[in-house]
């Protein structure tokens, strides 16, 4: 079952995204004093008077101009209206009625979707009524003055929105969502991949770098699992990013990585792994996210029977810190292997959430010690690994208790991680090993005993 939705529609720069943030009580929609900041339609959840619904932010609608992305933006607005339960037509009270407003109003009058006119930038309540009265001429009923910046009038507006929803529309069941972020440099095919996954033109696609300026959320049901898929803005080198739309979009993309259950890192099969790809991979590993590496544009590569193995070896040598990730080769354009992404992403999320009993962990460690003893230093002191336990998941984290962490070099630590993976799996997920010395362990035990004594005395 789906939530009712309202489509926010209007000319460029009338304050649609600011109003979206006000209605949703968030800062998720990018707000910047420049037309064309919002291009694709973006979704946010909101609630009012105990009723939950979705707010769909759209790009500035212009009918008389076909330059840049305006035709594609129109398509996105049309799709938003098509699926909406109600349209909120936002106009600028300070500018008054414009030819652009009249064109949009004519189009909305021909739509079957109910429309409410919100006259924005009415910061003064008394003046707002006067400013709003001019918009009766749009022929869409009573215009309502609001201030997206200060919030005045938005409560009354939300009451109208709730009353305007169809009474028989079901409210969405509470269901856990798996959040999957599509991450990558500009123009590697992230939006094409989103469209291929959804089976519709969910995002604007072009050869121009930076077409996607914000993170686009899409809900999709796949094999009894509900996925929230986020297409993020392409992330370039910091020195090439100017303050403005791209800056905010990239910050949003980084936040998406941090909040994701699983990241899909998209690599261009033609360009291979760049420095920026490595930095993105490092961010994913640093944040402890599950990951699937997707090599896009595979249809453009000339290949023989060994090409895929050679290319994978080369890519993995540069993405060595994601050695645990599954790598698949796809074509977003033709749809080749696109649906396999869900299978690998679900497996990665499952491994990311896994917990293993202490007894099983120690069986693996015992076997690992049998194959290869801890190193002995020149001083003659040898490392001793007493036992280990999993202390958390997402990502799976293990504490290993030893006599002295300094006696375990990087080579042996990698060996232990390899043995844990070999015996316990965790493909698609990072794992963290915390090495704790005897002194630290004894200190923790002593602290624990003191706490027990304090409790007993009380």
Curated annotation (Swiss-Prot):
Keyword annotations from UniProtKB, A to Z: GTP-binding, Nucleotide-binding, Repeat, Ribosome biogenesis
Domain EngA-type G: 4-169, 178-353
Family matches, as PROSITE patterns: G_ENGA
One annotated GO molecular function: GTP binding
InterPro entries xrefs: G_ENGA (IPR031166), GTP-bd (IPR006073), GTPase_Der (IPR016484), KH_dom-like (IPR032859), KH_dom-like_a/b (IPR015946), P-loop_NTPase (IPR027417), Small_GTP-bd (IPR005225)
Residues where GTP 2 binds: 184-191, 231-235, 296-299
Residues that bind GTP 1: 10-17, 57-61, 120-123
GO BP, sorted A to Z: ribosome biogenesis
Residue ranges that the Swiss-Prot or TrEMBL entry lists as coiled coil: none
Domain called KH-like: residue spans: 354-439
CDD domains in the cross-refs: EngA1, EngA2
Function, in words: GTPase that plays an essential role in the late steps of ribosome biogenesis.
HAMAP family per UniProt: GTPase_Der (MF_00195)
PANTHER family associated with the record: GTPASE DER
Subunit structure: Associates with the 50S ribosomal subunit.
NCBIfam families documented for this protein: GTPase_EngA, small_GTP
Family per record: Belongs to the TRAFAC class TrmE-Era-EngA-EngB-Septin-like GTPase superfamily. EngA (Der) GTPase family.
Protein name per Swiss-Prot or TrEMBL: GTPase Der
The organism of origin for this protein: Prochlorococcus marinus subsp. pastoris (strain CCMP1986 / NIES-2087 / MED4)
């Amino acid at each position: 079952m789906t939530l009712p939705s309202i489509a926010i529609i209007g000319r460029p720069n009338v304050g649609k995204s600011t109003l979206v943030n006000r209605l949703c009580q968030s800062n998720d929609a990018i707000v910047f004093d420049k037309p064309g900041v919002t291009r694709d339609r973006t979704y946010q959840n909101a609630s009012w008077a105990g009723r939950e619904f979705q707010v769909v932010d759209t790009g500035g609608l212009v009918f008389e101009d076909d330059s840049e992305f305006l035709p594609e933006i129109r398509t996105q607005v049309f799709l938003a209206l098509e699926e909406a339960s109600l349209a909120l037509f936002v106009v600028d009270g300070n500018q008054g009625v414009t030819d652009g407003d009249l064109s949009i109003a004519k189009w909305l009058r021909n739509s079957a979707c109910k429309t409410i006119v919100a006259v924005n930038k009415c910061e003064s309540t008394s003046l707002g009524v006067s400013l709003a009265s001019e918009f009766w001429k749009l022929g869409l009923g009573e215009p309502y003055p609001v201030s997206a910046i200060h919030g005045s009038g938005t409560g009354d507006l939300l009451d109208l929105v709730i009353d305007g929803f169809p009474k028989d529309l079901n409210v969405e069941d509470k269901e856990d969502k798996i959040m999957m972020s599509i991450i990558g440099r500009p123009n590697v095919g992230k939006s094409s991949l989103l469209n291929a996954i959804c089976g519709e033109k969910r995002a604007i696609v072009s050869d121009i770098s930076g077409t996607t300026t914000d993170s686009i959320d899409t809900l999709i049901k796949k094999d009894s699992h509900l996925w929230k898929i986020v297409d993020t803005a392409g992330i370039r080198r910091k020195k090439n990013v100017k303050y403005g739309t791209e800056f905010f979009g990239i910050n949003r993309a980084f936040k998406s990585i941090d909040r994701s259950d699983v990241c899909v890192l998209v690599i261009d099969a033609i360009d291979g792994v760049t420095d920026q790809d490595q930095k993105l991979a490092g961010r994913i590993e640093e944040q402890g996210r599950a990951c699937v590496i997707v090599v896009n544009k595979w249809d453009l590569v000339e290949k023989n029977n060994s090409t895929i193995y050679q290319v994978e070896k080369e890519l993995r040598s540069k993405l060595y810190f994601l050695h645990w990730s599954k790598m698949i080769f796809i074509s977003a354009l033709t749809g080749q292997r696109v649906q396999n992404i869900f299978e690998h992403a679900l497996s990665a999320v499952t491994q990311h959430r896994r917990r293993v009993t202490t007894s099983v962990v120690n069986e693996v460690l015992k076997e690992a010690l049998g194959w290869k003893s801890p190193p002995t230093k020149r001083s003659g002191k040898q490392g001793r690994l007493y036992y280990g336990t999993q202390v958390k998941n997402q990502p799976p984290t293990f504490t290993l208790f030893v006599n002295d962490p300094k006696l375990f070099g990087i080579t042996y630590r990698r060996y232990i991680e390899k043995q844990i993976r070999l015996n316990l799996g965790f493909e698609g997920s990072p794992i963290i090993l915390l090495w704790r010395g005897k002194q630290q362990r004894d200190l923790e035990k002593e602290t624990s005993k003191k706490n027990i004594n304090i409790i007993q005395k009380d």
